Amino acid sequence: MLKSYRAVLVSLSLLFVFVLSGCSNAAPIDAHSTGIWDHYFVYPISFMIQFVAHHIPGASFGIAIIIMTLVIRSAMIPLAVSQYRSQAKMKKMQPELQKLKKKYGDVSKDLEKQKQYQKEMSELMKSGGWNPLAGCWPLLIQMPIFSALYYAISRTEEIRTSSFLWVNLGHADPYHILPIIAALTTFIQMKVFQSNITPGEQVQMLKMQQIMMPAMILFMGFAAPSGLVLYWITGNLFTMTQTIVLRKIMEREELQLQKA
């Protein structure tokens, strides 16, 4: 059930991004850019990066991308908290879900049995306060931001032509150092996140993703603008820190509830 929810939402989100970005063009981005995608998605990201860069010492666009990423991720903390709490509830419900699964066995060949199983599972999740969509929102929100950032970097000359450390933000890292760091931080971030996942099938699925996602990031990072790879790295480090902090807070809350 969770997989179907996520698959539908992710597919719709990707379709939304592709449709809007398809209406985009290669013209430079500024306040007069037209079209929903350019005016309401790409330009605000471009403006934010330029505004921050012009108000910090050295006018570093690399630092501006890092700050912008931290601001966006900080604004998404309430969604991350909701996601974490949802996972904690799912863990608590796991024994009951396993009993339900054992009770009905293989329901793939019996439509009536399958309907009854899904009905009882939905009731159990509802009574446990688990929201199957809670874990999807951070991903769905990041998709248009990620795509808009790519266009903001590639179509804003001031950002595209600026340098940060050894790279040009509008070009791929010639030494492939940033893509390797992005792939490593993606792997570590997923490893840290794994401890919050319910044991069983989801863990096996995550183990596959732990190999596929870093490999995909590495492959894409070889050709992606360095500014975009910098966004990945900053986001990964923020998510790792956030997961560790939230885990400690939730564990403390759980301990206090047990003592009460």
Swiss-Prot record:
N-palmitoyl cysteine: lipidated positions: C23
Example GO CC term: the record gives: plasma membrane
> According to the UniProt entry, where is the signal peptide?
1-22
The organism's superkingdom is given as Bacteria
HAMAP family in UniProt: YidC_type2
Stated role:
Required for the insertion and/or proper folding and/or complex formation of integral membrane proteins into the membrane. Involved in integration of membrane proteins that insert both dependently and independently of the Sec translocase complex, as well as at least some lipoproteins.
Q: What is this protein called?
A: Membrane protein insertase YidC 1
